[in-house]
Amino acid sequence: MRVDRVLDTNFLIARWREGEGGPASVWLKANANLILGIPWIVKAEFLRGAEIAGHDRQAIRDFLKRFPTVWLDEDKLEIYASLYSTLKKRNELIGPNDLWIAASALQNSVPLVSKNKIEFQRVPGLRLESY
């Protein structure tokens, strides 16, 4: 499925916590015409946090269903491996989940919506968009 942006976990958490009035909600309204995808690892991280916090599972499902899941494929494996190698050689590795998220955005040739610039700005070719 084609997506216009890939969302990071911190975006989903912000939107969940802030309700309709915060920056993530404002960004969503301003970009209502875009197809916003979440990488499989973002979905897993969000579900894990919701489970630990004891949030209602149906409410979480309803919240997530508006965002199509960006799944792993062969191209992403190669992008991940290349990114890992490049960042390791530069001694600038980022967390493994963040590396998968970056690979998802790069494989789809779309920006990543995140506030985690410290990690993601190290990834060559990754376009970042804040909210």
Language-model regions: role of each:
Residues 12-13, 47, 121, 129:
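Nucleotide phosphate-binding site architecture
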Residues 1-38, 48-61:
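Short, well-structured N-terminal submotif of metal-dependent ribonuclease cores
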